[in-house]
Amino acid sequence: MAMDAVVNTRCGTLRGTEADGVRTFLGVPFAAPPTGANRLLPPQPVVPWTGVRDATDYGDSPPQVAPPVSAGFDWDTGLSGGDCLNLNVWTPSAGAAAGPGVGTAGLPVMVWIQGGAFEVGSTAAYDGRNFARDGVVCVVINWRVGADGFLFLDDGHANVGLLDQVAALEWVRDNIADFGGDPGNVTVFGESAGAMSIGVLLSIPRAEGLFRRAILQSGAAHHVLPALAAERIGRSLAEKLGVPQTREAIAAVPVKRLLTAQTELKTELLAHPDPEHWGHDVVASLMPWQPVIDGDVIPRRPIDRIAAGAGAHVDVIIGTNTEDWKLFLAITGVLARVTEEGLSGTDSIEGFPPPASYGLPVRAALEAYRAHYPGATPGDLLAAVQTDWWVRIPAIRLAEAHSNAARTTGAGTYMYEFAWAAPGLGAVHALEVPFVFDTLDTNARLFGPLLGENPPQELANAMHAAWVSFATTGDPGWPGYEPASRATMRFDVTQDVVNDPRSWERAQWEGIR
């Protein structure tokens, strides 16, 4: 039976629950509600409260569009609303009871930044209790998505969704000791857009010193928009709303109307992915809302700053799933409809960019892919190319840049590949998440439908333990990555280290991505 658990923070007292050796605090505010005068602006400090604040239910999720059919599963967003800048904390009962200074340095802390194409996401989809079970303080954060988080109009404000993440990490720095955590031993980890966000956080001055380690799952440091492309999206949104092209005018639009306009804009992008109209970076990624190189929050391309030494003191794990992008082609039905003509052509394939749009020498590259994937359908080949462009090659580039820069700091760089194939689907995007959280049973809230029957618990044991070990000591249990060997841990029913997996595939993208 759950009991009350109480903790005092800088802003006030929280009442959560305690059960099975874990204390849980839900819906904890880390910034003021981004409503009214604060809408579409950077996060503002929480106003302290008196008395005891209830922290037994999930807080609001950020306003967001309906998940696309390509999500492939029910997205549990909980209650979407304005008071959305909140987070959840799971901590071992002993550590939380002891408060600051547990042992000599407190418990390791892991902060999860969720994915969702910078359009959807909710803390209600993730359960961190098994990290707490294993001696880690786990935090899952909300942050603004879509236009609420990434509207850009070149008006002095940008990347407020990214600044939400920074504000949450500052809250962790200032308060996590009250939950038994060590603010000097924080690991950020995230998947997809969450991992892409971490790639940016590694590079920007405002996040420096807020985390010691980072894990990037199927996302790296390449998905950002140039200011010109992002401004074009922002002004197109204002035109669709019929309001002046100012932040104040868009902020005055009711939430539902703004979300409807975002859906219409995305539908137009998918139906007519013209680079001349939208910009190449938007069309190639199919994501109109992304972090923006504004010259302030993001001074320049994150991968370039990392290559120059930003984040070189941070230990990192970087990884991808073998068939990441196949998920989106399979569940939309496009996978079975791709033709050889479409694969070799220059036109969009039902909204998905063809290989030619990525700068590949199409004929030679497709010959190489066919040779190494005998029997692959045109859809399989498109999935392989898009997996490389979206996540695998950016992950390799990030590992190369970080490992080179970290030679002078001693920080570790580690690479993994998640290779377990779900029945009838493959080792697709997001499939690793319930293994990392060790929630293959009824707690696999978001990604459980992808797993099929009887997913291997031994794989969850291995991945979860590696993540906990890395957060605790900086060592996940396999050799570090360096360009000479490119050691990569391959996670399947059994695990083994492979040097430079699919080197031929990497070679196709030299000088391109």
Report each predicted region and the residues it spans.
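Active-site loop->helix "elbow" adjoining a glycine-rich segment at hydrolase catalytic centers
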Residues: G115, V160, D164, S192-A195
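Alpha/beta-hydrolase fold nucleophile elbow
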Residues: P108, F179-E191
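Alpha/beta-hydrolase active-site loop
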Residues: C84, H157-A177
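Substrate-access "cap/lid" subdomains that shape
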Residues: E208, Q217-G345, L382-A401
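Mobile gating loops/cap/lid regions near enzyme active sites that modulate substrate access
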Residues: D60-P63, E367, A384, R392-R513
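Non-catalytic accessory segments of hydrolases
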Residues: M1-N159, P183, S285, T322, ...
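Short glycine-enriched nucleophile-adjacent loop
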Residues: A195-A207
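Catalytic nucleophile serine of serine hydrolases
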Residues: G190-A193, S218
